[in-house]
Amino acid sequence: MLATAKMSGVAFAEGVPTPAPVQTPTAADDPAASKFSKLRGVNLGAWLVLEKWMTSDTFGGTEAEDEYTLCQVLGNKAKDRLDEHRDTFITARDFRWIKSSGLNAVRLPVGYWALEAPAPYVECSRYIDFALDQCQKNNLKLVLDLHGAPGSQNGWDHSGRAGAINWPKDPQNIEETLRVLESFAQKYGNHPALCGIELLNEPRQEVPLDILQKFYQDGYTRVRKYLAPDVAVVIHDSFRPLEWKNFMQQPAFNNVILDTHLYQCFDHEAKTRSGLQQLAFALNRRTALDEMKTEELPPMVGEWSLSLPHKAMSGLSSLQMESVTRGYAGAQLLNYEATRGWFFWSYKLEQPSEWHFRHCVERGWLPSDFSV
């Protein structure tokens, strides 16, 4: 999902812009992209890839900070601990609620250990099956997102193992990632609910661009042969949103979506802005989204939340804080509706917060019906 020092990598003007009319992409823009014409969804974060800050109870009784270490510490008890979490954190009731809210999609983060788990990980393939089947039952689409790669593509806990960024340093790590992606495509490529496979979540800027671009091209080749034309291949911008012009163009590459993650709470420059300035910043993101958009690589916003730096709320009354939060939600939705789709991070956490989609809806910060 995120780390405490992430930035969008794009500078935005401070002035309050006049938003351009939103033109929703449709299947007519690209007939092969019909499953990805307008997705409104949530991430099922911390379910099949653990994040301690979201589900600390799962880490109870240990000092582990990531899934790798937790499984290592628990040893032969790891499967029972993780299965209990996986069985209860997301259930059929959650998919029904997601559908009832008017959303039409979920983004499902999984690790490279999902199908075949090297020690100490615990595989979770039956939960992917469950998620896809629940999506089909509730007329939802699913983006399968490879959130953690061998060696770690970003060094953050949500890659499975926090620490060094070793993924790009060993060709075997990259080849294993490609093998896993091909296995995903073989197993799930024909599922009616699948609308996209994301090749890699949030590869950090330290990953050399040439290595990452070759990986994306190779990954496309490995999965596309198993996917219907209307199932997208999704690539993340690596927090370098303007580096993808003229990349993976048609006709060699078809139905590719560029994922960007937009968080103001981790932008160092944004931490000094007032609440009003935060709203102006959010409104101005449309400019950045337009700048990164190309005909070949239309964008989606794969992660966003309502969390803002503490400075934004400093000195505000409760009513003002509520107004800023609602305004921030509206500003983001206004702009993200102009993309192929968006996914809030995350559907739920153990504790209510600006990251907890259901809580945000119940508080009135977000709409209660997204089907309008």
Language-model regions, residue ranges each:
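N-terminal export signals
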Residues: 1-15
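N-terminal carbohydrate-binding accessory modules
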Residues: 15-103
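Hydrophobic faces of well-ordered beta-strands that scaffold small-molecule active sites
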Residues: 38-44, 106-108, 142-146, 195-197, ...
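Aromatic- and acidic-residue-enriched segments that line the glycan-binding/catalytic groove
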Residues: 52-65, 120-123, 151-169, 253, ...
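A short acidic, glycine-rich active-site loop
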Residues: 76-88, 164-174, 277-287, 323
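An active-site-proximal structural segment forming one wall of the substrate-binding cleft
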Residues: 84-106, 116, 120-148, 158-196, ...
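Extracellular glycoside hydrolase catalytic/binding regions
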Residues: 179, 186-189, 193-196, 200-333
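Aromatic-rich peripheral "rim/lid" segments of glycoside hydrolase catalytic domains that contact
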Residues: 318-372
